[in-house]
């Protein structure tokens, strides 16, 4: 038998690795996430131009220029990168998929323990697992995947319920309410909140490079959602009627001019602690001036190495009457059980709820 004939009559060869990668990338390029990324990138680039034109006090700081240098490659990403967007969110929270791979399965029991502690704290119906979409990751704690971010968001939802701030948002027949998250990151908490409170308008306020993550993530997870992004055609007129929108994406300098919008609740997680006293007080002052009646904070009162902040509670307390909400006697970062609970000092995490 001729050699050529014997080769052709055998089973088809497996495609090479390069062909497999190309097929995977082509598949991601046909997914909605890629189209969402292309639109989000153009919007964020316009925001970046506006940001650069602001004065030195409002424009990008040296710190944020350095931080953005860690993920500026996302402005020239491929479909394969966007299809695994969650792999790259560690630039914002430090949570990496590597720590949840099978060779770390021995850590799963600690996450199951922490999930149980949160359930006992009053979160029976508030857990929203990490979605698999866009490369989601975590350990299976029973009802789904969870990582440190997932459990942090779960803890804040429990705190909001304990503060009496969540119930009105969950009412299906009540008026549509608006929540503003200062520093929404990659959009993980927005996903959980909107899943539990679909009759709400969610405003993500963050620095332009970070909005690249949240716009893509939330538009992909909620394909039917009505979204409004700073700078799009007719943006100013549309913002005056914010209630029809599910998600609104704003840079910080646009927040003070939301006079026409009704804001029912503002939330911040672990970024007030990294700001200066003037910046934290500035946000509280703006929210108060806009008529926001309630503010929720999960932050260290002051990060150990932040010499430019007095305390978060002092800065917020000038504009809101604060109450500490007791959720757990351990910080959200503690997953494994400790025999003795850690003492809560000025550098410990505190759940604070403020009323105007």
Kindly give the residue locations of the regions a language model identified.
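Conserved Class I S-adenosyl-L-methionine-dependent methyltransferase catalytic core
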Residues: 49-172
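Conserved class I S-adenosyl-L-methionine
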Residues: 173-185
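Rossmann-like AdoMet/SAM-dependent catalytic core
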Residues: 3-79, 252, 314-356
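Conserved beta-strand signature within the Rossmann-like core of class I S-adenosyl-L-methionine
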Residues: 289-302
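A short, conserved alpha-helix within the catalytic core of class I
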Residues: 274-287
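Conserved SAM-binding loop of SAM-dependent methyltransferases across substrates and taxa
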Residues: 186-197
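Conserved SAM-dependent methyltransferase scaffold
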Residues: 157, 190-191, 211
């Amino acid at each position: 038998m001729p050699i050529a004939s014997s080769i052709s009559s055998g089973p088809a060869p497996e495609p090479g690795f390069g062909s497999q990668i190309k097929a995977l990338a082509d598949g991601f390029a046909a997914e909605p996430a890629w189209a969402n990324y292309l639109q989000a990138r153009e919007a964020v680039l316009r925001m970046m131009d506006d940001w650069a034109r602001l004065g030195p006090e409002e424009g990008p700081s040296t710190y944020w220029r350095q931080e953005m240098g860690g993920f500026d490659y996302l402005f020239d990403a491929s479909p394969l990168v966007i299809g695994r967007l969650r792999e790259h969110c560690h630039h914002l929270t430090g949570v990496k998929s590597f720590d949840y791979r099978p060779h770390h399965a021995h850590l799963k029991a600690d996450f199951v323990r922490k999930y149980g502690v949160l359930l006992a704290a009053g979160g029976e119906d508030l857990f929203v697992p990490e979605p698999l979409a866009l490369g989601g990751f975590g350990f299976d704690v029973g009802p789904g995947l969870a990582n440190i971010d997932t459990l942090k968001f779960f803890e804040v939802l429990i705190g909001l319920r304990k503060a009496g701030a969540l119930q009105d948002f969950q009412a299906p027949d009540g008026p549509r309410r608006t929540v503003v998250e200062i520093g929404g990151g990659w959009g993980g908490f927005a996903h959980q909140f909107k899943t539990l409170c679909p009759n709400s308008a969610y405003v993500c306020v963050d620095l332009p490079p970070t909005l690249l993550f949240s716009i893509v993530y939330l538009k992909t997870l909620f394909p039917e959602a009505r979204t409004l992004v700073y700078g799009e055609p007719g943006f100013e007129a549309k913002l005056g009627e914010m209630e029809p929108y599910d998600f609104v994406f704003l840079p910080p300098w646009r927040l003070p001019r939301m006079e026409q919008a009704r804001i029912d609740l503002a939330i911040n997680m672990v970024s007030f602690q990294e700001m200066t006293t003037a910046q934290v007080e500035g946000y509280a002052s703006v929210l108060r001036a806009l008529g926001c009646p309630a503010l929720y904070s999960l932050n260290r009162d002051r990060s150990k190495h932040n010499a430019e902040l007095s305390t978060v509670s002092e800065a917020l307390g000038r504009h809101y009457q604060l109450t500490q909400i007791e959720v757990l006697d351990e910080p959200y970062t503690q997953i494994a059980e400790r025999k003795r609970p850690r003492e809560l000092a000025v550098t410990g995490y505190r759940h604070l709820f403020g009323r105007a």
